[in-house]
Amino acid sequence: MVVGLLGGSFDPPHAGHVHISLEALKRFRLDRVWWLVSPGNPLKPRPPAPLPARLAEARRLMRHPRVVVTDIEARLGTRFTAETLAALRARYPGVRFVWLMGADNLAQFHRWDRWQGIMRTVPVGVLARPGAGLRSRTSPAARIYARARVGAADLAAARPPAWCFLNLPMVDLSSTAIRATGRWR
């Protein structure tokens, strides 16, 4: 079983999250995608909407038999991705995990706690986001791990460090823009 992990605040979840999840299932040859709705992001200056509201909206929006919306990070008590990955790998030893992120996150991945450990632990699938292509492909992480880049169809079986940048048709939505309209919270 190969599970893609899409971590995020999902504040709010939107059609762009759905789109990249379905593309990741198909192009990275994943069996499942788990939306890890985070209790909070240590790199963001303001707290997100309450977790129950974000979970409920994510479950309403993402209705696919191979995508699971979960609050497992809150239940595990993990705060950083590296901790979450360690806990999930211990809890599910037979599952192969692939970390999924938008290109905007790759651009600042080097700021994450133990980011190089994440790269050495699981394959990483990076999905294009509007306006983030060049910044992500020239980021410190992309430069340091340039030789570890693999094709989309090979990512799930690749031995870490391995990563793939997936160009795909993009949905021009962002949680930040949705919040700015006042349609959320």
Curated annotation (Swiss-Prot):
Entry keywords, A to Z: ATP-binding, NAD, Nucleotide-binding, Nucleotidyltransferase, Pyridine nucleotide biosynthesis, Transferase
Catalytic activity, reaction form: nicotinate beta-D-ribonucleotide + ATP + H(+) = deamido-NAD(+) + diphosphate
The keyword ATP-binding is assigned to this record: yes
GO BP terms in the entry: NAD biosynthetic process
Enzyme Commission code(s) on record: 2.7.7.18
InterPro entries the UniProt entry points to: Cyt_trans-like (IPR004821), NadD/NMNAT (IPR005248), Rossmann-like_a/b/a_fold (IPR014729)
CDD domains the UniProt entry points to: NMNAT
Pfam families: CTP_transf_like
Domain of life: Bacteria
Any one GO molecular function term: nicotinate-nucleotide adenylyltransferase activity
Assigned protein family: Belongs to the NadD family.
NCBIfam families attached to this UniProt entry: nicotinate (nicotinamide) nucleotide adenylyltransferase, PRK00071.2-2
Name used for this protein in its record: Probable nicotinate-nucleotide adenylyltransferase
Species this protein is from: Cereibacter sphaeroides (strain ATCC 17025 / ATH 2.4.3) (Rhodobacter sphaeroides)
